[in-house]
Amino acid sequence: ELPKLERDVFDEEEIGRALEELDKMVGQTGIKKQIRDFVELARHYSHEGVKLSSRMSLQWCLTGNSAMGKGTVARIIARLYKAMGIVDKGQVFDFKVERMIGLMEDEAQRSIGEALVKSSGGILLFDEDSPKLNEAVGFRERVRALLMNQMAEHPGSYIIIYAEPRNRVSGINGDAEHMSDLVNVLVFEDYTKEELMIILKRRLEKERMKMTATARQYMTVFIG
């Protein structure tokens, strides 16, 4: 089972560093607020000596278009969970669901089981964000059912972060109606033109490069 959240187990310095990394992300102000609110609520329950998992979900669903930072946010959540004493390892095991296309059911079950074992003590990022899955009707639902069956055998033993394409939030059990009771949902908004330019500038700076005025003008038109 997940360790019981006790009072004063929070590593506030590490929480601060994780939140600093969160703040460095471009845009996504709503997501930043949701995560900070989660941390504050978790801190409140910790001070009260209340087991966090008895009051709020520890599972997450990240939905949005590709390349919006879902993997980065998953790693930040893992760091926060380790600092809060929720998991032993602040690591994320990335499981690409598209790799299961074409597998027999017993092979798929074995693959999911191995992924859960590898993620034990950390977090499993169950990545369903792939255009290949759109072509396989009902595939996501079948794979999700296999995952749920294995998790049901060891309730409370695993923490899952689901990464889903935009407008496909289905929740931990595939039931959108009850989804908010079972997972914390983070919706990634598309970047604005200004935010895309900031991201481009940062990447160029990492390569010790700069845009010329002509290049900047071209990119402004291209992004627009």
Question: Which stretches of residues belong to each language-model region?
Answer:
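Walker A/P-loop
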Residues: 54-90, 117
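Conserved catalytic/switch belt of AAA+ P-loop NTPases
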Residues: 130-161, 176-180
